[in-house]
Amino acid sequence: MDFKNAVKALQIGKKEGKKFRLSTEFGKNPEEELPFPEYPRPQMRRENWTNLNGWWEYAFTETQKMPKQRDGKILVPFSPECDASGVKRQLLPKEYLWYFRTIQVPKIPAGKRLLLQFGAVDQDAVLYCNGKRAGGHLGGYLSFSVDLTLYLKTGENELAVKVRDETDTDWKGRGKQSLTPGGMFYTAQSGIWQSVWMEWVPETYLERIVITPEYDTASVKVRVFLNGPDTGLTKKITVRESEAPDAKVICIRETRENEAELILGNFAGWSPEHPHLYGVSIEAGEDRVESYFGMRKFGIGKDEKGITRLFLNGKPYFQN
């Protein structure tokens, strides 16, 4: 773009253009179809879980008091501002957006806990179970979980999520989302915008795992983090040739420590051209999760001409 065209592209002194909504086939979701039916957290999968995506009730309020009336239905996990949600309304900084739905708990198993998982809620979320505050989270981009166990009752349980999003009017909001979109700034999005699900776990469960491939030593390190103090629980780690459940087992390690290194021997390296992934199962007591990893290493080095390059698996790798 030359200087004249650059000046013409400026918004200064221009009248506001006519606004219209962009829509695609992806914004159309049949009412009977469950959005995103797959397990939402591919690197830490549990077998028994319940998808809570779908139609929730919602209400906009000007106060923090939980409303008795509902404004309608919203399709989770689509933000209220987008067409797919069925709402098409902006959440303003001084408003609150409430989500409501019920879950059925026929029986509360002994020695189990029920975790409610959120992929992301923008921006400040507070969760209530049967009218009692169960937890919350500040930040619109990270996942979080809430333990519902203490607030449950047998039968029907009501969940309520209160959301506030101050967007670009507060120090917490940075980026291109704006209440006055134009140019490179786009309409702010708010509320639940990633999948919601629940899963039963034992009293002591895997809260987080970290898998680190060690390319040079043909091994992989696995760290586990439990939800509470570790009392010497045995952890079992199994690495398979692929993510298929019946794939050949390469190595198994049992330990009471929270970190273990497993030797793979000859391995298939990961690259964009050959994206081979190994499957891994991690067990800690009664809890079990499935995950995966690729054997690769990144770095910066000099090529044969002495030019600094990005290296993948010990070789210069071009990317643009």
Question: What residues fall within each predicted segment?
Answer:
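Accessory beta-strand-rich segments of carbohydrate-active enzymes
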Residues: K8-I12, L22, F26-P30, E38, ...
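Conserved, mostly hydrophobic/aromatic
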Residues: W56, G131, V196, Y278, ...
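Short strand-turn-strand beta-turns centered on an Asx-Gly dipeptide
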Residues: Y128-A134, R240-S242, G285, N313-G314
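Beta-strand-rich binding/interaction modules
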Residues: C129, S219-R253, A260
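Signal that preferentially marks extracellular ectodomain short beta-strand elements
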Residues: V146-L150, E261-P275
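Short, aromatic- and glycine-rich surface loops/edge beta-strands on solvent-exposed regions
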Residues: E158-V161, H274-G285
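Surface beta-strand/loop "capping" patches
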Residues: W200-D230, G306-R309
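N-terminal carbohydrate-binding accessory modules
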Residues: I209-V210, G279-N320
